[in-house]
Amino acid sequence: MVSINEELEVAKAAKAAIKALLPATSKPAVLATLKKANRAAILNLSSGGALNEARGKVGIALSSIMHGLPTKEKIDEAKSAIDAWIKELEGSL
């Protein structure tokens, strides 16, 4: 488990990384950043609330990208999930 501040840093890095990802490409550095974000979101899941819902959505969206070809729809879904995750993390500080 990581602190909220560390999780927020990872979330912001994922937001920057996802912007570099294009449909039908998989860049190793981008995927490594997304994997780290996915891990942080999943490891910090607890019993409920808006933050945990955001973590779950990020986990699903990032897994979809990491385990298949990134499509525009998957990338857009991940961007939206990351934005919601960041918003909830910032609200938890």
Segments the model singles out, each with a brief description of its role:
Residues 63-93:
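Amphipathic alpha-helical binding modules
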Residues 2, 25, 45-46, 62-63, ...:
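Intrinsically disordered, low-complexity segments enriched in Ser/Pro/Gly/Ala and basic residues
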